């Protein structure tokens, strides 16, 4: 089970790998679309890689609710619990 | 009480005699005359050329005019494929048309195409959307080897512009028109590997005609268009289909390093790129990227890409190509073939 800071760190690495965005830029209050400029297909790639890394399932219907980095971290933490 | 019916037992059936192997002998394509650049469609969807290219890799597409129908485009592609195969038209014994945009509920397009080619052979349509061409190749392979036909014309054709909502931001720039065809016939050596195919109807709503014909009639709706849940399709196409492609390679008894071409359905450049990454294909293998100037022509996309790449010398005649189609249904089919 990963802590919230570990999830954030892992997520930042996944975002960096997909988009090249610096890991330090991936902060909890940032919006994936508005702040990080991540489009829907990159978001799906991030979701699938996060599923694999954290051993969780993020349904397609849930992805649209993950607006900020915090949303994603909370969802992953909840799904792991 | 009468006794249970018993067979006469006097007649023995003659089994059809098929060819030992089958292969693709030639491919042909038809690209509609009118080139439609992104600039022509961006205003309606409040978009830009850059936005479309970033999300799909598409720079332009062809949209068929009123004189270019599913049937006429099929005929043009078929004639080219027959010529490339080096056979006479009257040697064709079956015509399979894969399409989702033939504007008649019935009859099928195939008999009309056959008639236009001067043929009276078996002719039928299949509905397997973007996977239709690979379904057709598999059927043709089985027909040739099973003895139900000698040379088979497999045609993938779409006029998706008739079923596209120009204001739909998720599909307006994706769908396009065209036809591709292949001639499959007997061969001394194996030319079509085992097909890995299947369906997931639980996801039927991810790509579909938005309203049924009955809803259109009963609710007085406009002519229906095809809608798509892009993200769900993307996930399924990349992470669901890469293993299918790998299974087709394995079933063919080869390795990825043996391939001379990777010809995925031209759905979206992002899907193609992600799939190549997932498959860990050796970097030297040419990958079909016909989508840049053709967009997504559904059933026509693989034969159109094949025809272009062969013509431009990008892939070798006689080489091994992995082809995979996937789309509405959801359905998929993949096989390794020897290029004509």
How does the language model describe each region?
Chain A
Residues 57, 64, 70-78:
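C-terminal structural segments of small proteins and small subunits
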Residues 22, 57-59:
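Short coil/turn motifs that cap or connect alpha-helices
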Residues 25, 29-36:
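N-terminal helix-turn-helix DNA-binding core of bacterial DNA-binding proteins
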Residues 42:
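Two-component histidine kinase catalytic core, primarily the HATPase_c
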Residues 2-24, 77-80:
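Thiotemplate assembly-line natural product biosynthesis machinery
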Residues 13, 48-49:
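Core alpha-helical elements of the protein kinase catalytic domain
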């Amino acid at each position: 089970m990963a802590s919230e800071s570990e999830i954030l760190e892992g997520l930042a690495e996944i975002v960096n790998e997909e988009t090249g965005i610096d890991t330090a830029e991936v902060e909890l209050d940032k919006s994936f679309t508005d702040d990080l400029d991540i489009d829907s297909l990159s978001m799906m790639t991030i979701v699938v890689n996060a599923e694999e890394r954290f051993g969780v399932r993020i349904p397609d219907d849930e992805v649209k609710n993950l607006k900020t980095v915090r949303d994603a971290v909370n969802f992953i933490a909840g799904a792991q619990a | 009480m009468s006794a249970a019916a018993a067979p006469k037992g006097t007649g023995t059936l003659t089994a059809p005699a098929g060819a030992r192997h089958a292969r693709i002998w030639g491919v042909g394509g038809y690209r509609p005359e009118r080139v439609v650049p992104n600039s022509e469609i961006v205003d309606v969807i409040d978009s830009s050329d850059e936005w479309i290219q970033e999300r799909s890799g598409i720079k332009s597409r062809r949209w068929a005019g009123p004189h270019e129908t599913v049937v006429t485009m099929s005929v043009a592609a078929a004639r080219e494929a027959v010529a490339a195969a080096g056979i006479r038209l009257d040697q064709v014994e079956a015509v399979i048309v894969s399409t989702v945009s033939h504007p008649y509920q019935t009859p099928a397009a195939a008999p009309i195409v056959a008639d236009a080619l001067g043929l009276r052979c078996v002719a039928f349509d299949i509905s397997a959307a973007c996977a239709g061409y690979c379904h057709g190749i598999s059927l043709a392979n089985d027909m040739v080897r099973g003895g139900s036909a000698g040379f088979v014309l497999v045609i993938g054709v779409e006029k998706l512009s008739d079923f596209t909502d120009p204001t739909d931001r998720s599909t307006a720039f994706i769908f396009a028109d065209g036809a591709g065809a292949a001639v499959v016939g007997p061969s001394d050596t194996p030319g079509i590997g085992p097909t890995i195919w299947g369906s997931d109807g639980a996801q039927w709503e991810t790509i579909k005609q938005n309203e049924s014909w009955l809803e259109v009639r009963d609710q007085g709706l406009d002519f229906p268009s095809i809608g798509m849940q892009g993200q769900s399709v993307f996930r399924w196409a990349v992470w669901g289909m890469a293993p299918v492609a790998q299974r087709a390679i394995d079933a063919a008894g080869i390795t990825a390093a043996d391939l001379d071409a990777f010809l995925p359905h031209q759905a979206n450049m992002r899907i193609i790129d992600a799939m190549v990454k997932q498959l860990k294909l050796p970097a030297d293998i040419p990958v079909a990227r016909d989508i840049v100037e053709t967009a997504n022509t559904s059933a026509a996309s693989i034969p159109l890409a094949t025809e272009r790449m062969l013509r431009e010398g990008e892939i070798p005649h006689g080489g091994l190509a992995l082809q995979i189609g996937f789309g509405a249904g959801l359905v998929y089919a993949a096989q390794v073939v020897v290029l004509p």
